[in-house]
Curated annotation (Swiss-Prot):
Superkingdom assignment: Bacteria
Keyword tags: Amino-acid biosynthesis, Arginine biosynthesis, Cytoplasm, Lyase
Keyword Zinc: no
Source organism (scientific name): Mesorhizobium japonicum (strain LMG 29417 / CECT 9101 / MAFF 303099) (Mesorhizobium loti (strain MAFF 303099))
One Gene Ontology term, aspect cellular component: cytosol
HAMAP family: Arg_succ_lyase
Chief location of this protein within or outside the cell: cytoplasm
One matching Pfam family: ASL_C2
The keyword Amino-acid biosynthesis belongs to this UniProt entry's keyword annotation: yes
Protein name: Argininosuccinate lyase 1
Gene symbol of the encoding locus: argH1
Length: 466
């Protein structure tokens, strides 16, 4: 395509001269909005079909338009299409090439349409498609976590608060916590799809059009539930993009938390897991190193995704109705966040699937830090009838004694414990073992292996219907 066809020829009837070079540079978006080519062509074909069906253009012109657009689609996908920055964006690049191919009939395509509703429908279609991709990726990650949870439903590990050993849990239970988080992310994706499932096409510049168009027809042709009900809203808001970015930011934050734990667990000091070579790198100077770079990059890229949400919120916060060129800044945020999230989900699914779990190291760590202290307090309440606050105090004294003797709680003698409360009997030792502590947590959603397996069965059924 020749640069002789400038943007000035598309909208420049009232201008005496073309834009300055710097204006063309700052105004052009083709370097990134070319990603919308498939959606742009899809929307244009649906629009042309509606124009013909309502008698606004002839069937002959519509057939030429559709044939030309399909030719352009093939050119772009083959890599032979010549994009021009002087034509600003994907819409005008496609329209200019269409004019090259079919002549004056191309000029009828933009009847009853503005670039304002055109870009709104293009981006909405793209984001909707991306939401479906994210949903599938999330299902893959949840499946990987469920497999790990099932494998390690009874594998004991320490549960932490403030990064201090708090109570014993199972690794399966820990994995299921992330299943719940990512399942909510999946729900957020679906909620976003539901809200964005309306077509802005036909709103034209902002006020609608005097042509007898059929917006319901184009909405259906493009796979939307219905057309948007207000033409001003149709072209002026980007909350569907913000919905996507908010979902992406929350999901990325969940991924980052899991990545942080993987990084910690894979250190020699913890030794809970070993990442596969496929998701690790080495050092250029230290030959012994095996670095958890995939997890670190997931953690690092979260800031990038979160930044895109804040960036677009900031763009939109001062926008009066309806359209302003500020909105051109929506696309790079969305495109980069989507690409980044796709990578993060794929990397995390791979790490979870391939990592080796060191159950022995987890079990050993689970007994440290007096992790069964709460079990001791609960036993005092159940067996001796102590108020919980008094039981908490007695247990605290037992912990202090254990630390003084440099032993774990279960290594204290019965005499030691009776020196704190004479009512304590030898039965206390059954609750101080970490395995028994875990088995006793049978409340709904608890860490007992029996309860973890119930939750695994529940989510497997839910996922099968998803």
């Amino acid at each position: 395509m020749s640069d002789k066809k400038t943007s000035n020829q598309m909208w420049g009837g009232r201008f005496a001269s073309g834009p300055a070079a710097i204006m063309e540079a700052i105004n052009a978006s083709i370097s990134f909005d070319r990603k919308l080519y498939a959606q742009d062509i899809r929307g244009s074909i649906a629009h042309s079909e509606m124009l013909a069906q309502t008698g606004i253009i002839s069937t002959a012109d519509q057939e030429k338009i559709a044939h030309g657009l399909n030719t352009i689609l093939k050119e772009i996908e083959a890599g032979s299409f010549e994009f021009s920055t002087r034509l600003e964006d994907i819409h005008m690049n496609v329209e200019a090439r269409l004019a090259d191919l079919i002549g004056s009939a191309a000029g009828r395509l933009h009847t009853a349409r503005s670039r304002n509703d055109q870009v709104a429908v293009d981006l909405r279609l793209w984001v909707k498609d991306e939401c479906f991709r994210v949903a599938e990726a999330l299902k893959g990650l949840i499946t990987a976590l469920l497999a790990r949870a099932e494998e390690h439903a009874a594998t004991v590990m320490p549960g932490f608060t403030h990064m201090q050993a708090a109570q014993p849990v199972t690794f399966g239970h820990h994995c299921m916590a992330y299943v719940e988080m990512f399942a909510r992310d999946l729900s957020r994706v679906r909620d976003a799809i539901e809200r964005m499932d309306e077509s802005p096409l036909g709103a034209a510049a902002l006020a609608g059009t005097s042509f007898p168009i059929d917006r319901h027809r184009t909405a259906k042709a493009l796979g939307f539930r219905e057309p948007m009900r207000n033409s001003l809203d149709s072209v002026s808001d980007r909350d569907f993009a913000l919905d996507f970015l908010a979902m992406a930011a929350i999901c990325a934050t969940h991924l980052s938390r899991l990545a942080e734990e993987i990084i910690i667990w894979s250190t020699p000091q913890f030794g809970f897991i070993r990442l596969s070579d496929s998701f690790s790198t080495g050092s250029s100077i230290m030959p012994q190193k095996k670095n958890p770079d995939a997890a670190e990059l997931v953690r690092g890229k979260t800031g990038r995704v979160n930044g895109h949400l804040v960036g677009l919120l900031t763009v939109m916060k001062g926008m009066p109705l309806t359209y302003g060129k500020d909105m051109q800044e929506d696309k790079e945020s969305v495109f980069d966040a989507a690409e980044t999230l796709d990578l993060m989900l794929a990397a995390m699914t791979g790490m979870v699937s391939d990592m080796t779990v060191n159950a022995a190291a987890m079990k050993k760590a689970a007994g440290s830090g007096h992790a069964t202290a709460t079990d001791l307090a609960d036993w005092l309440v159940r067996t001796l009838g102590l108020p919980f606050r008094e039981a908490h105090h007695v247990t605290g004294r037992a912990v202090a004694l254990a630390e003084e003797k440099k032993v774990s709680l279960e290594k204290l003698s019965l005499e030691d414990l009776q020196s704190i409360n004479p009512g304590i009997t030898a039965d206390i030792f059954s609750v101080l073992a970490v395995q028994n502590s875990v088995k006793s947590r049978t409340s709904f959603g608890g860490t007992a292996p029996s309860e973890v397996r119930k939750q695994i069965r529940y989510w497997k059924k839910r996922l099968a219907k998803a």
